[in-house]
């Protein structure tokens, strides 16, 4: 008889765990009251990048493993994954190229002619940025990828049940393991005061002729991410519980992205808001034995790196579960 796994949450972490468990022979069920574009994952720009998550000594190895998995998926035209060059800029001073980025082939960008061998000189944006670096990374079109994961999960025998889990005791006892991918919801579900919501708002605009993703983490935070059928303008990152779109934020986002790209402000198709589940003490990926004897494996607190960490964390969760059962 197959081991049974109950997974709480249908964002990218929950769906990826579901795929890994189901494809490794588990009888897996996902419990979630929000799916697809209604999840926090649906509001993500979803460019692979270790962003807004701790600790670095775990985040970077997990990110690199997931980089490899997503690069493989980019070969499947149905997955919603592709490879894209990202230009990471700074407005003041120099942006250091992290060692992990160098190992992936990152090269410096200068807005003025550079004597650095292998550097890329960008004539655009000279008055806006000082320098940056270019790197090829996986890009996830969430409008395709989340459905791809859900279909892959179903095809492997998995089930998604619509349910709002208020307490873990509501999970039927005939499951061998419970996997907690509740994101910011883990704060109430498991009384974790280390979680704080980092609010992100984006504006989806019509598709632009943009060959690269443009990102700047300096204030004001901005990014323009080209996708299959549209473009994501962002963004915000503030500690807030507010899931409602802010008209002022939308105006600021579209204005800054348009200014950087040197274009007229495009019409906004839709505005999305998500609460990044940042955990002050770092991503929680560990096994816990509940007072009733059941096993929970936590997988949450990924901050702004949910897609970036998804496959490595899911594989580690499944490995822990396999040793437990």
Named regions from a protein language model:
Residues 23-42:
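Glycine-rich FAD pyrophosphate-binding loop
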Residues 55-65, 132-148, 244-248, 308-309:
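Short beta-strand to alpha-helix junction loop
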Residues 34-37, 163, 169, 176-217, ...:
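Central helical "cap/lid" subdomain
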Residues 148, 269-325:
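C-terminal catalytic lobe of FAD-dependent flavoproteins
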Residues 133-166, 172-175:
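Helical element adjacent to the flavin cofactor pocket in flavoenzyme catalytic cores
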Residues 4-29:
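N-terminal Rossmann-like FAD-binding beta1-loop-alpha1 element of flavoenzymes
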Residues 72, 209-211, 228-230, 238-279, ...:
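Flavin-binding catalytic cores
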Residues 45-129:
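Dinucleotide-binding Rossmann-like beta1-alpha1 core, especially the glycine-rich loop
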């Amino acid at each position: 008889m197959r081991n049974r796994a109950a997974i709480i949450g249908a964002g990218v972490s929950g769906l990826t765990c579901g795929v890994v468990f189901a494809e490794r022979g588990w009888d897996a069920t996902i419990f979630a009251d929000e799916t697809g574009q209604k999840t926090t994952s649906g509001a993500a720009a979803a460019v692979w990048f270790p962003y807004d998550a701790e600790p670095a000594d775990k985040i970077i190895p997990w990110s690199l493993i997931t980089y490899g998995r997503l690069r493989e998926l980019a070969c499947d035209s149905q997955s919603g994954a592709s490879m894209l060059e990202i230009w990471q800029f700074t407005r003041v001073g120099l942006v250091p190229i992290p060692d992990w980025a160098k190992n992936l082939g990152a090269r410096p960008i200068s807005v003025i002619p550079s004597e650095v061998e292998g550097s890329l000189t960008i004539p655009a944006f000279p008055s806006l940025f000082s320098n940056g670096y270019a790197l090829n990374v996986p890009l996830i079109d969430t409008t395709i990828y989340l459905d791809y994961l859900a279909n892959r999960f179903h095809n492997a025998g998995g089930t998604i049940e619509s349910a709002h889990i208020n307490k873990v005791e509501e999970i039927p006892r005939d499951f061998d393991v419970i996997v907690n991918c509740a994101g910011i919801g883990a704060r109430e579900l498991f009384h974790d005061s280390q979680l704080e919501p980092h609010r992100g708002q984006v504006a989806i605009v019509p598709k632009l002729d943009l060959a690269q993703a443009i990102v700047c983490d300096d204030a004001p935070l901005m990014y323009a991410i080209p996708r299959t059928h549209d473009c994501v303008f962002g963004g915000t990152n503030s500690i807030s519980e507010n899931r409602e779109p802010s008209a002022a934020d939308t105006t600021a986002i579209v204005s800054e992205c348009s200014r950087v790209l040197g274009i007229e402000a495009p019409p906004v198709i839709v505005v999305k808001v998500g609460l990044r589940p940042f955990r002050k003490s770092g991503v929680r990926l560990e096994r816990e034995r509940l007072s009733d004897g059941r096993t929970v494996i936590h997988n949450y607190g990924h901050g702004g790196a949910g897609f970036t960490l998804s496959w490595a964390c899911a594989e580690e969760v499944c490995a822990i579960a396999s040793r437990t059962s």
